[in-house]
């Protein structure tokens, strides 16, 4: 007979190892598993471990040519999710050798590549990953990081201010550059290409880059502050993307931008390497993230996408606002923020952080709050995000009744007032509105902005809760 036992396997025998002690070099994953009716959680959990590592559905004789014990993923713990029927958190440990060094693409292909279509599962969500230093050290990470960015821009002790130029599509390059100049001249640090501004018939990329660079230098000369505009280098091919980044560097601008999920991790990592080699900051937009992370029981939580971005490389990334028009629950969002900025993050289930995450010397990423925010949100944003963040007001700048420069000035005054109040020991959470009101007495621009947006509320319940 053959030298192995043919037939369909019971995954549980090989891949369920509750006695396993995880190694410091293992990549650990926490999956939220919803098994099909009648499938026991151990069976579902081990199926995940197997299919995302060495397993296949039947015994193959080539198994005998390798050491499964060395390479298999192990399901080492299963716990029911409180308050949910038939949902379990399944913990899987993957040996480091399963992954190519320095490749977020390969990491995701392995861990989430196949297993989400598995018949035994009704739904599956990757909640968190623990990236060991042995693996994170194989990545360059963010091109520059928070401290280097502050030194490049010469801006300290406060959040940075941005504005997405609207209408996002349809402006000519010259009119677009005019809006950029007005916002920067009015007091913002950055303006931003919208994520879907690439190179369309009404505004080709090269024209936009030129007019924006002109706007930037003019505003810089007039204000004596360093200014930036996130020039979106996202393109249809990697070669074209790099070509745009090269042109940005030749113009001498400080920062470019990329849509990392639609562009892909391979392209993003290439761009991040180029940016470090050439002194460009890299702003990352997370377009398409909600397709992946919004459903509570299926997909990938954004905290995993945020960790992946820190490895792949980016200096800023959108992380939700807590207060604006888009999804973001406070504790969960703060979980993203600390994972992006800090060197060492303790396990904290109240923020959805399933594992203690050491980043050792990987630079940090500035979280960007953007989407439906205006001057009345400034105290809350300053309080929640702290100094190391970028606050982006698109409509909250360009929607000012007196135009763009006053809109920018209103935001800058509101921010400076909040930072000053905080530094003097005031509690922004409680006294924030008073701080804004007081500041608006000596700033007509702010006073007008306060009037326009005083009643606007964009409140809905968050979909993704703990």
Curated annotation (Swiss-Prot):
Record's comment on post-translational modification: The disulfide bond which can form in the large chain dimeric partners within the hexadecamer appears to be associated with oxidative stress and protein turnover.
Modified residues (N6-carboxylysine): 192
Sequence similarity: Belongs to the RuBisCO large chain family. Type I subfamily.
Protein name: Ribulose bisphosphate carboxylase large chain
Subunit and partners: Heterohexadecamer of 8 large chains and 8 small chains; disulfide-linked. The disulfide link is formed within the large subunit homodimers.
Its biological purpose: RuBisCO catalyzes two reactions: the carboxylation of D-ribulose 1,5-bisphosphate, the primary event in carbon dioxide fixation, as well as the oxidative fragmentation of the pentose substrate in the photorespiration process. Both reactions occur simultaneously and in competition at the same active site.
GO-annotated cellular components: chloroplast
First-listed, main subcellular location of the protein, grouped into a coarse class: plastid
Record PTM N6,N6,N6-trimethyllysine, positions in chain: 5
Species for this entry: Drosera capensis (Cape sundew)
Gene3D superfamilies xref list: Ribulose bisphosphate carboxylase, large subunit, C-terminal domain, RuBisCO large subunit, N-terminal domain
Presence of keyword Hydrolase: no
Positions marked as site (Transition state stabilizer): 325
Residues engaged in binding Mg(2+): 192, 194-195
Catalysed reactions listed for this entry: 2 (2R)-3-phosphoglycerate + 2 H(+) = D-ribulose 1,5-bisphosphate + CO2 + H2O; D-ribulose 1,5-bisphosphate + O2 = 2-phosphoglycolate + (2R)-3-phosphoglycerate + 2 H(+)
Cofactor annotation: Mg(2+)
Recorded GO MF terms: magnesium ion binding; monooxygenase activity; ribulose-bisphosphate carboxylase activity
Keywords: Calvin cycle, Carbon dioxide fixation, Chloroplast, Disulfide bond, Lyase, Magnesium, Metal-binding, Methylation, Monooxygenase, Oxidoreductase, Photorespiration, Photosynthesis, Plastid
Binding site residues for substrate: 114, 164, 168, 286, 318, 370
GO BP, one annotated term: reductive pentose-phosphate cycle
Location of this chain's protein in the cell: Plastid, Chloroplast
Residues annotated as catalytic: 166 (proton acceptor), 285 (proton acceptor)
Note on cofactor: Binds 1 Mg(2+) ion per subunit.
Comment field (misc): The basic functional RuBisCO is composed of a large chain homodimer in a 'head-to-tail' conformation. In form I RuBisCO this homodimer is arranged in a barrel-like tetramer with the small subunits forming a tetrameric 'cap' on each end of the 'barrel'.
Keyword Lyase on entry: yes
């Amino acid at each position: 007979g053959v030298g192995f036992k043919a037939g369909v396997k019971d995954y549980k025998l090989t891949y369920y190892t509750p006695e396993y002690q995880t190694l410091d070099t293992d990549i650990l994953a926490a999956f939220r598993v919803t098994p099909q009716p009648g499938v026991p959680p151990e069976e579902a959990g081990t199926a995940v471990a197997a299919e995302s590592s060495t397993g296949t559905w039947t015994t193959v004789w080539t198994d005998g040519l390798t050491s499964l014990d060395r390479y298999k993923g192990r399901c080492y713990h299963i716990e029911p999710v409180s308050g949910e029927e038939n949902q379990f958190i399944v913990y899987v440990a993957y040996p480091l050798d399963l992954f190519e060094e320095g490749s977020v693409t390969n990491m995701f292909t392995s861990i989430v590549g196949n297993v989400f279509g598995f018949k035994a599962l009704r739904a599956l969500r990757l909640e968190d990953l623990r990236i060991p230093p042995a693996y994170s050290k194989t990545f360059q990470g963010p091109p520059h990081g928070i401290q280097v960015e502050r030194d490049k821009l010469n801006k300290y002790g406060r959040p940075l201010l941005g504005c997405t130029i609207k209408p996002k599509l349809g402006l000519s390059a010259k009119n677009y550059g005019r809006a950029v100049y007005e916002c920067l001249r009015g007091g913002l640090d950055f303006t931003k290409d919208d994520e879907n501004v690439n190179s369309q018939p009404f505004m080709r990329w090269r024209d936009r880059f030129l007019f924006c660079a002109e706007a930037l230098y003019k505003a810089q000369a007039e204000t004596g502050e360093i200014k930036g505009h996130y020039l979106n280098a996202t393109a249809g091919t990697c070669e074209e993307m790099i070509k745009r980044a090269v042109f940005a560097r030749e113009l001498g601008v400080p920062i470019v931008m990329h849509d990392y999920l639609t562009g892909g991790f391979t392209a993003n990592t290439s761009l991040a390497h180029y940016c470090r080699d050439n002194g460009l900051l890299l702003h990352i937009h997370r377009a398409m993230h909600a397709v992946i992370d919004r459903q509570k029981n299926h997909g990938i939580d954004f905290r995993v996408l945020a960790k992946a971005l820190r490895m792949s490389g980016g200096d800023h990334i959108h992380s939700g606002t807590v207060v604006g028009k888009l999804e973001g629950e406070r504790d969960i969002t703060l979980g993203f923020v600390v994972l992006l900025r800090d060197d060492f993050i303790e396990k904290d289930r109240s923020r959805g952080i399933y594992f203690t995450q050491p980043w050792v010397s990987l630079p940090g990423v500035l979280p960007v709050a953007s989407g439906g925010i205006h001057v009345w949100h400034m105290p809350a944003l300053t309080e929640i995000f702290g100094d190391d963040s970028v606050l982006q007001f698109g409509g909250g700048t360009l929607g000012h009744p007196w135009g763009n420069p006053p809109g920018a000035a209103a935001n800058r005054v509101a921010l400076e007032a909040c930072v000053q109040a905080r530094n003097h020991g005031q509690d922004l959470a409680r006294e924030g509105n008073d701080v804004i009101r007081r500041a608006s007495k000596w700033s007509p621009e702010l006073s007008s902005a306060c009037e326009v947006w005083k009643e606007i509320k964009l409140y809905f319940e968050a979909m993704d809760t703990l």
